[in-house]
C-alpha cells in the first residue's frame, strides 16, 4: 500500500519506518534528513500538506509529537501536536487516503483540565471530522525506549520504575502502564489496510493483542 508518514524521527517513528518499508511504498515527510531507508520529502512542517499534494496515498500515519523542552511555549507545542497533524491528515484525505493511524495518549479528552490531554482530545475529534473510512487512534501509556535527553524528569522516573509499577497495573489500570514503543509501532503496522470501517481506539491491551 502507499503509506505517508510524519514523525519518522521520533521514538515510535524510528521503529515504525523499517517495518512499513518492508511491505509498503513509504513516503516520509520530515524537517530534516532521517538516514532511514525510505523516500523522503524534506521541508518545513508548514509545507508538508502542499508537498503531499501530488502523490496518491492509501494510508496516512502520524507519530508526530514534540516535548515541552523542545517547543518552549504552548503555541509552539500546539503547532506540532495539533496543527501539523491535522494539516497533514486533511492533505492525505484529499489525495485519497482512506485510513489514518495516529498516536494520541491514554486519558485524551477534549474536556480534560490537563492541557496536554485536552489537546490530544481535540486532535482526535478533528481527525474524526475529516472523513476517513477508518480512523485508528493509539492511546498507549508511558512509552518506553531510547529518547536521549528529551524526556522530562518525571518521565525518566516513570520509565525507570515501570517494571515495578506495571506489576500492579492490572485490569482497567493496565491502560496506564508503560509500554515499549516498538510494540506500539508493530501494532500500527498490523492495522495498515484493516478492512472494517469506523473509529477505533486502542489502549495498551488492544495494542498488545494486535502484536500477538
Language model features: what each stretch is:
Residues 12-16, 88, 123:
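Hydrophobic residues within alpha-helices
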Residues 34-35, 39-87, 91-94, 109:
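NAD(P)H-binding glycine-rich loop region in Rossmannoid oxidoreductase-like domains
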Residues 6, 29, 63-64, 100-106, ...:
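SDR active-site strand-loop-helix element
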Amino acid at each position: 500500500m502507499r503509506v505517508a508518514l510524519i514523525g519518522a524521527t521520533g521514538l515510535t517513528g524510528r521503529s515504525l519506518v523499517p517495518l512499513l518499508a518492508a511491505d509498503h511504498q513509504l513516503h516520509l515527510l520530515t524537517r530534516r534528513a532521517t538516514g532511514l531507508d525510505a523516500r523522503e520529502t524534506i521541508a518545513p512542517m508548514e509545507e508538508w500538506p502542499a508537498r503531499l499534494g501530488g502523490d496518491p496515498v492509501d494510508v496516512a500515519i502520524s507519530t508526530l509529537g514534540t516535548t515541552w523542552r523542545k517547543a518552549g511555549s504552548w503555541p509552539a507545542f500546539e503547532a506540532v501536536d495539533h496543527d501539523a497533524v491535522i494539516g497533514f491528515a486533511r492533505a492525505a484525505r484529499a489525495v485519497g487516503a482512506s485510513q489514518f493511524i495516529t498516536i494520541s495518549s491514554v486519558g485524551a479528552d477534549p474536556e480534560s483540565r490537563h492541557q496536554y490531554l485536552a489537546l490530544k482530545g481535540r486532535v482526535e475529534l478533528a481527525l474524526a471530522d475529516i472523513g476517513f473510512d477508518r480512523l485508528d487512534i493509539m492511546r498507549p501509556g508511558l512509552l518506553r525506549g531510547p529518547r536521549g535527553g528529551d524526556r522530562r524528569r518525571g518521565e525518566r522516573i516513570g520509565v525507570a520504575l515501570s517494571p515495578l509499577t506495571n506489576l500492579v497495573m492490572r485490569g482497567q489500570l493496565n491502560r496506564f502502564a508503560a509500554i515499549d514503543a516498538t510494540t506500539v509501532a508493530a501494532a500500527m503496522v498490523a492495522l495498515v489496510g484493516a478492512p472494517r470501517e469506523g473509529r477505533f481506539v486502542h489502549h495498551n491491551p488492544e495494542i498488545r493483542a494486535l502484536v500477538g
